[in-house]
UniProtKB/Swiss-Prot annotation:
Residues 1-37, 94-118, 184-191, 267-279 are extracellular. It is found in: Cell membrane. It is a multi-pass membrane protein. GO terms for biological process: adenylate cyclase-activating G protein-coupled receptor signaling pathway. It comes from Alouatta sara. The chain crosses the membrane at residues 38-63, 73-93, 119-140, 164-183, 192-211, 241-266, 280-300. This is Melanocyte-stimulating hormone receptor.
Amino acid sequence: MPMQGAQRRLLGSLNSTPTATPNLGLAANHTGAPCLEVSIPDGLFLSLGLVSLVENVLVVAAIAKNRNLHSPMYCFICCLALSDLLVSGSNMLEMAVILLLEAGALATRASVVQQLQNTIDVLTCSSMLCSLCFLGAIAVDRYVSIFYALRYHSIVTLPRARRAIAAIWVASVLSSTLFIAYCDHAAVLLCLVVFFLAMLVLMAVLYVHMLARACQHAQGITRLHKRQLPAHQGFGLRGAATLTILLGIFFVCWGPFFLHLMLVVLCPQHLTCSCIFKNFKVFLTLIICNTIIDPLIYAFRSQELCRTLKEVLLCSW
C-alpha cells in the first residue's frame, strides 16, 4: 500500500515483530488515554475478499460470454469488476502471505519478501486507481447517454471506449509505480487525495445534473398528461434517495482510506491521528466492501447480464 501504515507488514511478519506503523499506538502507550481501535478478524477480512473475488469473476465471465454485452457501457462495467477483483485479490494475497510468515509456514529471505511487498503494493495501488477511474468513466458514459442521446453511439464508440480503457490501465500502472517508489514524499500522498476528491466531485456533478434532467423530464410528462404534482415530487424524492445512496456508499467506503493518507501528511506525529492510523485495516475492509457493492449497483441491475450469469452458473455445474 502506498503509505507508511502498510509498507512493512510483510517484513514485520518475517522478523516476528508487530506489524504496526512506526508511531502508531504511541498515544495510548505514553499518555494512557483511550484510543479507539476496531479489530477486524483475519478470517472476516479474507471472507469478504473471497466474496468480492467470486462476485466480480462472475460479472467478468457473464460479460465476456454474451456478445450482446460487448458495448462500451458494459466494457466499462467489466473493467470496473476486473479492477475490483484485483483490489480484493491483492489484499487477500498480502494477508495470506502475512499469515503464512507469522505461522512459520513460509520461509524466505527478507529481500524476496521486500520484492513481493513492492509487487503487491503496485498491484493494489494500480487496481484502486483503476477502480476509481472506471467509476468516473461509467458516470461520464451515463451522462453522455442522457444529454446526447441522439449522438451517443457516434460519440461513445467501441474503439474509443477501448482506447480509453487502455489509457486508464496504462496510466494507473505507471502512476502507481511512481507512487510506490516515492511513497515517502508528502506530494505523492496529496496527489492521491486530490485524485479521489476530483473523482468524487466529477461523479457528484454528473449525477446531480442527470437527476435534475430526469426531474425536468418527469415534470414535463406530468404537465402533458395533467397529472397531480405529488407524483413528480415522489419521483424527485426517489431519484434523490438513489443518488444519495450511490454517492454515500462511494464516500463512506473510499473516504476513510484517503483521509488516512491526508492525515499521514498533515499530522503524522499527533496523538489523535495516531489513533486513526491504528484503524487502517478497517479502511481497507471498507474498500473491500465497496468492491462487493459495485456489482450490485452497476452490473446485477441489468436483466440481460443476470440472464447470462444464470447461464454461466448452470454451465459450471
